[in-house]
Amino acid sequence: MSQNNLNGAQVVIECLKREGVDIIFGYPGGSAIPMFDALLDSTIKMVLSRHEQGATHMADGYARETGKVGVALVTSGPGATNTFTGIYTAMMDSIPLVVLTAQTTTPNLGKDAFQECDTSGMTFATVKHSYLVKDPNELPRVMKEAFHIARTGRPGPVLIDLPKDVTAGICTAPFTEEMNLPGYKIPGTAPDEMVEKAAALINKAKRPLLLVGHGAMISDACRQVREFAEKLNAPVTSTLLGLGVFPSNHDLSLGMLGMHGTVYANKAV
């Protein structure tokens, strides 16, 4: 798609396509009209929810099942605030999510305009990062950064607040692969000396036990966990989100830990 004469909403939709998005979940409203208009000419499928909270949970569930970034699209004010439970669920469970919230026009920000709220500010503690876009030319970079942040490191939700004049305005900036994230550091692998130290401590352990969590699931380490447990002959217990990493019918399985877990798993730990 050519960059010529595209408005902000069309740029957002094109960026979604470039990130491999083929389905989004949402509920329309006045400030989001440019976004929904842009979807009419797109191959991206729109799944209409009956409530914005439902749209966010649907995007969350889609991300859990497919491993892709889930995308939700809602309108301003109550549409945005209705997403907060779904956003925080994704944050706590490390689910990659991009939530697009419409907003009043930029000249009306901070003036108690109709359905205006500080969406990016209110979600600051419940997302990996939040954006308030005030210039259509920022959209290509912001979209690229948002998906990168959502899916890398410990996955999680990113919110992009889109004023109506930004999605309706013309964007002249090119689509880009460049990002400006000087403070965003993705943890690397552990140094060899740290791995060797951990291995030495494990070898000295008299009663080793493995506690398996969600990280093993999202890193696709199920086979390695099983091989490690069998080599150590160590019992394995799991967090709620780690269920499924280790076979529950295995002789070394103690089941889930915690208040809803098994007695013997809790006593073993």
Where are these regions (language model features)?
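N-terminal alpha/beta PP-like core and its mobile active-site loop of ThDP/TPP-dependent enzymes
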Residues: 2-269
